[in-house]
Amino acid sequence: MLDYYTTWVKLCFLWGTGEDEQDGYDPKGKQWALGGDTWVVGCKIPPEAVVFPEFNDLNPDEHDPRYNTEHGVYAPHCGLDELMFAWGHDEYMYRMLVANNTAIPREGLDIIRYHSAYPWHDRGAYKHLMKPEDEQRLEWVQLFNKFDLYTKDEGNDLRGNFTEDLWPYYKGLCEKYGLGGKLKW
């Protein structure tokens, strides 16, 4: 299913390089722009969505009847497209790509948007909000995540002076998928 020779997949991996480059990370900086798991907002936060669910009680939404039920503001099986996710780097990049009418196919956009939604694709949360056609989207994200951030081999650290060598190739990929020139950010 995930063909390494499919060029748009390479752009999905390229998108994640910002997380690799945060060695000098400043905790006072804009961490939301670099990494972090995401979850659905507008409904009860399931315990499997966060590392320390005992802190969910500190969230005002936990006490708001509009948001503190299993479905919250959503209809059962409304589908992924109807859900709002916590804002982060994934959602930002997804919206930027859509705003620029990228030619990256739906599968690639789903990978970018949902790959940090670990409660959904890794822990089985939100199935009650999925449409049947969302199952294939789940398969794509799960397949991609086998090769993503947390599974990288530290022995294959590609940081260094590769930019000049790789720039022409990736610039060509960006142009192929409608991301050359000026972009709407």
Predicted region positions:
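Divalent metal-dependent catalytic cores for phosphoryl transfer on phosphate-bearing substrates
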Residues: 1-164
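C-terminal helix/juxtamembrane-tail motif
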Residues: 167-185
